[in-house]
Amino acid sequence: MPNFIVGARLHDYGKGTPDELFGQVSADGFAAVQLAYKKCVPTVKSYADVTDALVAETVAAEKAHHIQVAVLGTYVELAINDESRLCNVADFKSQLSVCKALGAGCIGTETTAMSKQPAGTTRAQAQELLCRSLAEILPAAEALGVTVGIEPVTYHSMNSAAATRHILDTMRSPNLKVIFDMSNLVSAENVDAQDRIWYDMGALLGDQIVAVHFKGQAFAPDGSLLHTSLEESRTDYAGAFAMLRQLPQPALPVLREEAVPARAASDIAFMKGFF
């Protein structure tokens, strides 16, 4: 069974310096973070603003506050069917060396919502574009020894365990792994079939998971998504962790997304109840 390390998404704590933000999450009892510089450091407007000095400051904050950067969040549209895709690939590649310098567990991204695609774009086309992007990224990641984590989401180009397995099999890179956001694989259509979701994740991708996201969600009568507390969520955490506890990884970060700092203690207790 993995050692589960409880963490938080850093930009849920607002904006500040790495030292300020890492100090806050550490004081609240978290031991790891997902760090997205553009979302939490005011001086970072573009990836070019992630300077060597900022990275060194972040490394110092990691050590001072005993915080692990589990995921370097570099959420760009790698499967978008327009001319911006190549710029997004360049942005992502520029952060690979940052990931290595931070000692981050992985550099992570989702795979583009289908609603953002030009009209007529099929999911198969979007997945092909994702593979083209990864084909440019992964050789550089392998050369640096950096892990790339891709995150399936029900309404994105890579929308299931099977779709994710297809991408991994296509790319055949030891440096391509999976971020498992439990709630992102649950929709109004499959909320009553979560046992199957967790089975598929474990069977197809279990040993490829490098981080877990933990958040609350439910669904309105029309099927639209509602953000909730963890206690009110429709996500079957117990079922998901029954699978996760069987995995061979020595450790897995479990990151609270949509964290509410005032609820940190109760959220951590709730999360650890499934470990």
Model regions and ranges:
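Histidine-acidic metal/acid-base catalytic patches
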Residues: 1-7, 14-31, 63, 103, ...
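A short acidic, helix-capping loop that chelates divalent metal ions and anchors anionic groups
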Residues: 41-45, 78-82, 115-121, 186-189, ...
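Active-site-proximal loop/turn and secondary-structure-junction residues that shape catalytic pockets
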Residues: 12-14, 37-39, 75-78, 111-115, ...
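Charged helix-capping and loop-helix junction motifs
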Residues: 48-55, 85-93, 123-134, 161-165, ...
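Active-site acidic/histidine proton-transfer and metal-coordination neighborhood
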Residues: 19-20, 63-65, 80-180
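Short beta-strand segments at enzyme active-site cores
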Residues: 34-35, 69-74, 105-112, 148-151, ...
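N-terminal pre-domain/capping segments
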Residues: 1-104, 135, 173, 177, ...
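A generic structural signal for short
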Residues: 9-10, 46-47, 83-84, 125-126, ...
